[in-house]
């Protein structure tokens, strides 16, 4: 019954945290359903076999939902590894975990990767102070430190026509909007970190923030890259609407889940640190980097503005 409930609950599209939270462990639910189905068929009686059939249905449904994020599916965003080096833009997105005290690991990572665009989440004044040397290298820095796990640091060496934090929902979680001039053309950057579906946090504000960001992307004349800890898995209903409203493409489709959270657990990991691109942007690479003491892995992307954009 638990497998059936956790499979059916997200179909209601309810905003309650105990509904939306079941979007996350679809792979885990499918595995439990398969095991339950096998056990049900081994016990020869009508009731257990009915349960086994229900488990197979649940497993198949969950598999259909997550299949696009397997290497067997067709990709929706081709890689362009031959993009000229001088036209590439590197982006680094990291939820640092506000309580994480391993500042030196992040400093070394930033020094090594030297991204053109740096987007850090869960940053407070302590983190801002710890990264002063690294941030001083960037032409544009937007600091919005907070002590509620939703502080943001945005930094870029690209010419910025606009770079600011805005509030797209009423839950005091800022979003970064930036219009940047890349080597081969301009593009728009959206950095998101909405609240997760946990006890005390239903998802109305998260879903509204994600939807409004997508609509902003749809209205700009520039190609758009959206990046950050969405606190939402790639296969959720909200993520699908985000892609539809903004015309986004997901590099995970057809390549694998590339789970980014929880970095401290080998079993319960989910792809919630996202990268989305609209037409007009080419993807050179998208990678998960090493553990830096946070509960999220750093995510790095290299993009280029498509020729003619």
Feature annotation, model-predicted:
Residues 27-29, 66, 207:
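Hydrophobic alpha-helical segments, especially transmembrane helices
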Residues 1-41:
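Membrane-embedded alpha-helical segments of integral membrane proteins
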Residues 91-92, 97-112, 117-309:
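Soluble catalytic domains of enzymes that build or remodel membrane lipids, polysaccharides, and related
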Residues 33-68, 173-193:
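Glycine/proline-rich, flexible active-site/cofactor-binding loop segments
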Residues 42, 49-112:
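N-terminal signal-anchor transmembrane helix
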Residues 16, 46-47, 71, 139-140, ...:
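Secondary-structure boundary/capping signal
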Residues 8-9, 77-81, 129, 237:
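Intrinsically disordered, low-complexity boundary segments flanking structured domains
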